């Protein structure tokens, strides 16, 4: 009986050591492979910002081609809100191409289409005389929201977003149900997210602060070379 117990303890001890070694190996691998970490479903602020920063050159290039170079941080803030930089459709722009959600499988296409859609909303918004918050909100609610705000003073508010959402829900109540969850914060305004513009602005501020720190670190590094 004692021999059996010793055998069980030995097996358990070996298993614990094996698990510890494997776990340690994975931790070391992750520590030295930042690209691998960014692909994992880990959403710490630092990792999310690293994902977004990877898209910065492409975002800058696409915005420059549209004459909107000043909006890099905003687009990255929108990406932060849409997907945290994860997946093949980081700008969640599939639907603006007439596709189903997440049907875009090329992240670069997602970014290009997302910026194309933002540019369209931006130009439409400027023509209609609405504020930037309305343009941001329209990325979530569509161009119809720009028309709606233009008819109600030209300045976005969450109350106007709720009113517009309510209108759209009445047109198709079986579709916009918040997943049937009455406890969803959007309920009963289940078309879009009436808080979208505010969330994007908060995340844009976070992105701007991160980019400023990165710029200062780069400058200091060059100064010490």
UniProtKB/Swiss-Prot annotation:
Subcellular compartments: Cell membrane
The record's listing under InterPro entries reads:
CwlT-like_lysozyme, Lysozyme-like_dom_sf
TM spans, by residue?
A: 12-32
Q: Which GO terms describe its biological process?
A: carbohydrate catabolic process
Keyword Cell membrane tagged = yes
State the superkingdom. Bacteria
Pfam family of the protein (one): Lysozyme_like
Disulfide pattern = none
Major localisation? membrane
Topology of the protein relative to the lipid bilayer: Single-pass membrane protein
Query: Which Gene Ontology CC terms are recorded?
Result: plasma membrane
Q: Which UniProt keywords apply?
A: Cell membrane, Membrane, Transmembrane, Transmembrane helix
Q: Does the keyword Membrane apply?
A: yes
Under PANTHER family, the record lists: LYSOZYME (PTHR34135), PNEUMOCOCCAL VACCINE ANTIGEN A (PTHR34135:SF3)
Q: Can you name this protein? A: Uncharacterized membrane protein YocA
> Which species does the entry assign this protein to?
Bacillus subtilis (strain 168)
Organism lineage string:
Bacteria, Bacillati, Bacillota, Bacilli, Bacillales
